[in-house]
């Protein structure tokens, strides 16, 4: 269960870090936005290493579903844009895929 906490915290820090770059490069905000962006993206990377998983690739794949959930939430809550039906449909497919990866059986490679 602690993995989900790390995933959600990592998603928030990653989205904020990327959004800070977006504000600077796409919306003409101050270049000082780079500072919190870099700090946030560093914290994101550190948080993702807290996930208990045998392989980084599997952890990142499972995290992808959480990231997409957080991104759609960010779209609505921070950017005040109502998600489209296609956003919700895509989110559902991604969450199903991430759940399969996260909860799927683990066999040895022997």
Swiss-Prot record:
Predominant subcellular localization, coarse grouping: membrane
Topology in the lipid bilayer: Multi-pass membrane protein
One cellular component term from this protein's GO annotations in UniProt: plasma membrane
Signal peptide feature range: none
InterPro entries: UPF0060
Residue stretches spanning the membrane: 5-25, 28-48, 59-79, 84-104
Subcellular location: Cell inner membrane
Coiled-coil intervals: none
Keyword tags: Cell inner membrane, Cell membrane, Membrane, Transmembrane, Transmembrane helix
Pfam name, any one: UPF0060
Similarity field: Belongs to the UPF0060 family.
NCBIfam families per the UniProt record, alphabetical: PRK02237.1 (NF002586)
Annotated PANTHER family: UPF0060 MEMBRANE PROTEIN YNFA
Protein name: UPF0060 membrane protein Psyr_3752
């Amino acid at each position: 269960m602690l993995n989900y906490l790390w995933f959600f915290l990592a998603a928030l820090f990653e989205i904020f870090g990327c959004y800070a770059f977006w504000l600077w490069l796409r919306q003409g905000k101050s270049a000082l936005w780079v500072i919190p962006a870099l700090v946030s993206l560093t914290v994101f990377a550190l948080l993702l290493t807290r996930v208990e998983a045998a392989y980084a690739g599997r952890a990142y794949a499972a995290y992808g579903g959480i990231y997409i959930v957080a991104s759609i939430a960010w779209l609505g809550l921070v950017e005040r844009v109502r998600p489209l039906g296609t956003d919700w449909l895509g989110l559902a497919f991604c969450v199903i895929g991430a759940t399969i990866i996260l909860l799927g059986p683990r066999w040895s490679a022997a």
